[in-house]
Curated annotation (Swiss-Prot):
WD repeats: 57-88, 101-132, 145-176, 187-218, 231-262, 274-306
Organism of derivation: Schizosaccharomyces pombe (strain 972 / ATCC 24843)
UniProt similarity note: Belongs to the WD repeat peroxin-7 family.
Lineage: superkingdom: Eukaryota
Keywords, sorted A to Z: Cytoplasm, Peroxisome, Protein transport, Repeat, Transport, WD repeat
GO biological process per UniProt: protein import into peroxisome matrix; protein targeting to peroxisome
The protein's name in its UniProt record: Peroxisomal targeting signal 2 receptor
Pfam families recorded: WD40
GO molecular function, one term: peroxisome matrix targeting signal-2 binding
Amino acid sequence: MLSLRTPGFQGESVQFSPLVENKIAVAAVTHYGLGGSGRLYIHDVTPKGIQVCQHYDVEDSLFGVRWSQNCENQVYACCGDGSLRLFDLTMPSKPIHKWKEHKAEIVAIDTNTVDRRIVVTGSWDGTIKLWLGNLPNSVQTLNNGSNSRILTVATHYSSPNLLGYTSSDGLCKFWDFRSSDKFMSIEIPNQITCMNWSKSNHRMVYTADNNNLVYCYDIANLKTPLSVLSGHQLAVRSIKSSNSAHDLLATASYDMTSRIFDPEQHSCIRKVDLHSEFVRDVDWSDFGDGSWIASVGWDESLYIWNAF
């Protein structure tokens, strides 16, 4: 297990680089995102531990981070002032691009592994925007309603056109970029807090709710989950699928734990309680045997640990 403290900055989002084995990015906030500034950290993961490679300070909170799928030196971060920013690690002073179309905080971001130009952002203004590369403006906007804040967004791992997202109306919905509107949704009695796709089975989608449960669905039948996974004591904040042929799920929860679930066994196979505050995000590394996981939380700590 490796760890690094980020004094004064609480972790909100973490992602291993998909292109460089030893790089990891963290988006962090001050004052728990209720005001103040943000910081983008770029770390090197070495045999001696996690080393701070560089960081970028911004004037508002940073709620999400995603590496570019095209350039190993570029990182997108979404900001509390409604802006999307692109940083280049070879230019350490400030972002090389800044887009500002959202009317409220951007709290969710994802990139697409099929069409590597695609970046998607979700905001508390109730909209999701689709961006392509470095074009000066977004190319599509989905309006989910001004009274419904977007919570999470996730592009499909094998389709360049499919997006899943959750919002404060409690639903998980799906959007095909070739259409101007959402086309189906998951509705359960409890509020859905986050979602993600399987990396190995293109039909599988995972959600979690404020009743502390994780649900596994076949997208062809969203009325009945294939599996319901229990273990967390408070709501799940983030779900990520492993890269292995046998899907495993890593979760981050407000109960201050991360857990590993096996949907086929319908069970939690590991509980990790390294953090002393809310765990805000987790991510699996694409490299090696795919067993390394990073987690960040409001305890101002980054941990990298083995799933097994």
